[in-house]
Amino acid sequence: MFSVLDWKPKIGILGGGQLGWMIVLEGRKYPFTFYVLENDKNAPACRIADRCFSPQDYKEFVDSSDVITFEFEHVYEKALEYAEYSGKLLPRLNSVELKRERYKEKLFYRQHNLPTPRFYVAEDGEEALKILREEFNNVGVIKESKGGYDGKGQYFIFNDVEKYQFLREKKEKMVVEEYVKFDFEASIIIARDKRGVFISYPPTYNYNEKGILVYNYGPYNNQNIVEIARRLSEELDYVGIMGVEVFVVNGKVLINEFAPRVHNTGHYTLDGALISQFEQHLRAIIGMELGPSTILSPSGMVNILGTDKIPVEVLKYGKVYWYSKSEVRKRRKMGHVNVVGNNLEEVKQKIDKIMQLIYTNGLDL
C-alpha cells in the first residue's frame, strides 16, 4: 500500500465523454494528474483534464501515464492494445474483448455457468432468422454481434418477421435469444481491486426504453445478484468498477450484459453513497484500498436524453449534472439528475416529477 502523497499517479483515460468527465471530477480530491485520449478537444473530459491527446498520439499518451483506463470499450482499439502490451491497462483487455463481439460474451456466461437467457449463435443473418423460426417460433431477439450498446443493433421480433428480411443480407455472426418476459430489470455496481477484494453497491431497479436507460433507483436488496456479479468478476480476474445488468423473472436472476467500466446505473452514487463509483474505480486501478460501499439514503437518477433545455423547476427535486456537449442528438445523454429521499417511495415520486418536467410530451427515443 502507499500514500497518495508519496505517489502522484498520472492516470490516462481512453475517451472524453461524460464518464471520463466524472472520473476526473471525482479524482480531483487527490493529487492525481489526468490525461485523456480523445478526438474532440471540446469533449467533457478534455475540458477538465490536465492534457488531451489526439488518437494518433496514443503511444505518447500511454507512455506518459502510470495506469490506463477507459470510459467506453468500443473505441481506440490500437490504444487499448498498446496499453495492455505495456502492462498499464485496467480493467484488462480480456473484459474488453468479450464486449467487442456479443456472442463471445454470451458464450462466456455459458462456459462459466452464469445464468443468462437461452440463446444460439448464428453465422449470419439468414441463419439467425432460421434459428428464430425453428427454436423460438418467430418470437425473440436478434442481436448484431458488434457495436451493441444503448439498444443498438438489437431487433425485437414478435411474429412480424417479414419486417426483418433485410437481416438476410448481413454476413456477420449474430446472437439469437429468447424474449424474456421479465418482472423488471435491475443492475449492480461492483468493484474489485488488484488483491481480489470485492465490494458491491446495492442493486437498483432500472427502467429502460428502446435499450437505453431512462431512470433507476434503489436500493433493491437481492443477494443473488451480488453473488452472480462476484462470480463474473472472479472469472475475469477483474480490476475496477463493473456494471452488471440483469432481468428478474419470478425471483430468478438472468444476466443481460455487463459493462467493464463505470456505468450509467451507478451515477446515483455521486450523491447517494459515501464513495462514488468513480472514486472507487480510481482506488481500484491505482492500488488504493477500496472504500466502503455505504449507501447514505435511498436514491436514484434520471437521464436527460436528446435535449439541452430543462425547466428550472427540476432543481427543486434533484441535483443536475450537465455534460455541456456541443451537439444535441436524439437519444444522446446530455446530462442527468440525481435524487435522494428518506425512502424509496419518496425517491420514486421525485423521479416521476422530474420525468414530467423534462419529457412534457413523453419520451421520444
Curated annotation (Swiss-Prot):
Keywords: ATP-binding, Ligase, Nucleotide-binding, Purine biosynthesis. It holds the Pfam family RS_preATP-grasp-like. The keyword ATP-binding applies. SUPFAM superfamilies: Glutathione synthetase ATP-binding domain-like, PreATP-grasp domain, Rudiment single hybrid motif. Pathway: Purine metabolism; IMP biosynthesis via de novo pathway; 5-amino-1-(5-phospho-D-ribosyl)imidazole-4-carboxylate from 5-amino-1-(5-phospho-D-ribosyl)imidazole (N5-CAIR route): step 1/2. One of its GO terms (biological process) is 'de novo' IMP biosynthetic process. PANTHER family: PHOSPHORIBOSYLAMINOIMIDAZOLE CARBOXYLASE, PURINE BIOSYNTHESIS PROTEIN 6/7, PUR6/7. This is N5-carboxyaminoimidazole ribonucleotide synthase. The lineage of its organism: Archaea, Thermoproteota, Thermoprotei, Sulfolobales, Sulfolobaceae.
